[in-house]
Amino acid sequence: MSDIISIKDIDLAKKKVFIRCDFNVPQDDFLNITDDRRIRSAIPTIRYCLDNGCSVILASHLGRPKEISSKYSLEPVAKRLARLLDKEIVMAKDVIGEDAKTKAMNLKVGEILLLENLRFEKGETKNDENLAKELASMVQVYINDAFGVCHRAHSSVEAITKFFDEKHKGAGFLLQKEIDFASNLIKHPARPFVAVVGGSKVSGKLQALTNLLPKVDKLIIGGGMAFTFLKALGYDIGNSLLEEELLEEANKILTKGKNLGVKIYLPVDVVAAPACSQDVPMKFVPAQEIPNGWMGLDIGPASVRLFKEVISDAQTIWWNGPMGVFEIDKFSKGSIKMSHYISEGHATSVVGGGDTADVVARAGDADEMTFISTGGGASLELIEGKELPGVKALRSKENE
């Protein structure tokens, strides 16, 4: 992806630099950050700017606020960032209001300003050019380091790039790393290449599954989405999650896999329970024998053994989506075991999506994976072969 303008191609000295980060981190009920991976991932780009004599304005969204609310404030992010960088972070009370503009204007070389949650401005998610213009007016250089939102045409991701020429906009280190990794994975995977796809919905991953089939050697389907495929095969799935309108599509994928010579593996047994709760009885049942009124909530031990065998000779594994309702302890075993087996092997292991990254962190396997992508939807769309709006905006025109 050498046609993407890199931060290294830009003269940053003594300039004000806007870095679009992805600080959309999980928090507990007391607003404590429970996983700061996304904040830590942004540090190399921030440090590079400081080392090159800039002043830095950071911007991000957090959650999906309907209105301005302290629950969605970036204050906790500012505190965590200050600790990680061992440096004071100036926090703006707004995004393009008087406070942000005054603080941006007075920012000196080596200082960092964090704007308040971008989504407090209604125009952010509408790709509003007026908002983009206001943000752009604070700085001389724009850097996008937020892979997790590159698939969205938002003001701070796409519209803003129209106000900078090629000498003054580019991709940060995290964004470059993510794009390079995903591109190489799709174009030159070491084989056998196995995709492990889970999560609750087929609808969200239909395009990715279709696009992956010609590229992979084997495909494992787990999680809630597996039941639509099992139903398509004529199995009785009890009260398990089902997207009835996608049964035909599921059948098409199974047929396409067969025609391409791709082995598709579905769960052979499941952990079934009458309800999705920690306090209900559970039992292991074959995938064809889920009792009426019960639902499958995790893959069972036989499926775990089968999937372990399937990935044992893999040279590349791409994993997106948990194998069960991992948030509930008794239905997390399948996902945790898959994480262990993927991380223990010799394959290049690429993990995409927030839920999957959470499983890997919970399993204690994060350091053993080759690459953990910070973007769920964005990594899916890259795998689907789509051009991401935030990335397209940073392409060098000469190479288009």
Curated annotation (Swiss-Prot):
Its EC number is 2.7.2.3. It is found in: Cytoplasm. It comes from the Bacteria. One of its GO terms (molecular function) is phosphoglycerate kinase activity. GO terms for biological process: gluconeogenesis; glycolytic process. Pathway: Carbohydrate degradation; glycolysis; pyruvate from D-glyceraldehyde 3-phosphate: step 2/5. GO terms for cellular component: cytosol. InterPro entries: Phosphoglycerate_kinase, Phosphoglycerate_kinase_CS, Phosphoglycerate_kinase_N, Phosphoglycerate_kinase_sf. It is an enzyme of class 2 (transferase). Coiled coil: none annotated. ATP binds at residues 205, 296, 327, 353-356. SUPFAM superfamilies: Phosphoglycerate kinase. Substrate binds at residues 22-24, 38, 61-64, 119, 152. It catalyses: (2R)-3-phosphoglycerate + ATP = (2R)-3-phospho-glyceroyl phosphate + ADP. Keywords: ATP-binding, Cytoplasm, Glycolysis, Kinase, Nucleotide-binding, Transferase. Pfam families: PGK. Monomer. HAMAP family: Phosphoglyc_kinase. Belongs to the phosphoglycerate kinase family. This is Phosphoglycerate kinase. It comes from Campylobacter jejuni subsp. jejuni serotype O:23/36 (strain 81-176).
